[in-house]
Amino acid sequence: MARTDATIRLTLTDAGKMLLLGTVFFFFTTMVIPAFGVLTALLSVLLTALLVGFVLRPRVRVTETVPDSVVVSQNVKLRYALENTAGVPAYDLQLQFEKMPDGIEQVGPTAVVSRLAPGETAELAVTVRPQRRGYYGIPSPICQSSFPFNLLSFGRRHRAEQMLTVLPVFYRLQCPVRHFSRHVRTGGTGFAGRAEVSPEYAGNRPFLPGDSPRRIDTRAWARLSVPATKEYHNDSDSRAALIVDSRVPARLRPSEGDEIPALEAAVSLAASIAFSINQNCLVDLLLAGPELHEYTSWLRSPRLHKIHEVLAGVEAAEGYDLDVPAAALASRLYDVAEVIFILLDWDKTYTQLLESAARAGCHSTVFLIDAPAQGPGETDEVNWADVVTPVSSDDILTGRIERL
């Protein structure tokens, strides 16, 4: 995005500060010992740097290219195109950030453009490394020049921000898909029958007796020399619901620091599961904290990216009411085959959801992060030992979990 509205900014470089201190020193020295020649020379250098620097101050148009998202702890380049809009050359141009957001670290210095002719464009890249997931406003950098003597720095400050979404860490897991192929539909409208949704093309296979002639793939037939039929992702057997708990109990809160390892592990595990099952199962419903998100009308790739974006913003909470989103989720369980719980603690709301999933014919899997010594026990519908898998936050964050 191009930025032309800016304010002039004048600062002293380290060398300029030393020269200014020397000038002040000789000023007071002349009160005792005649040293007007040295003082005059120093003042002349400062005035020359001020006048020349002001005349040749950078007047550039900055065009920013910031990626929409990046995974936490991965380096990313922020690219800036500098176009000299003045009628005189600009020298020693450099980009400098006044202050990066907490959680974003600049890696290494930025390059310097030694000379930029009028109308010429140069590109500079700034490498940053996000330390925490979340949504960040990246401020526009100051385009500054310390020409001619590297004593004073003239710059232009642009008051604008670009949003950067930092996604949680995720990696591929070996997830069994045997439950995703179970026929669990007991009624309702299938995915392809919804008016606002079109079936997603999956590929083709050999034509079998009983297949609809309307789905014959003529191109594949010509290529393979055998009848072939089109396949679509239009059944509810490969649908899942993902539930991520963000209520952090006191036993999981660290004594110091803002980052909660258990919550980060839960979010990372949720992102990894969504990524790993994406080719075999689509996440239709995501209950992230108290918010229920529905992705029925989204196609496969943008759906996964949207889920990761939502998980990037999950915040810790001491408590929230789950009755309304839980009721909305329970009414949709007949449309999915698998319900995956990622919990920090257990309460009766999740017990009720687990029972509702069992009555709907869904298979449920519960991952309890840093589980307490005693679980919730058994209910009339569900056996704790059959569905709950205790996992360690350290194992998740270090990538030691390879198979679920």
Predicted region positions:
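Acidic, glycine-rich A-domain
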Residues: S268, A274-L404
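Intrinsic-disorder/low-complexity, polar/charged segments
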Residues: T13, F28-I33, D92, V169, ...
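An amphipathic, basic-hydrophobic helix/alpha-beta surface used to engage anionic
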Residues: S44-Y295, E338-I342, S356
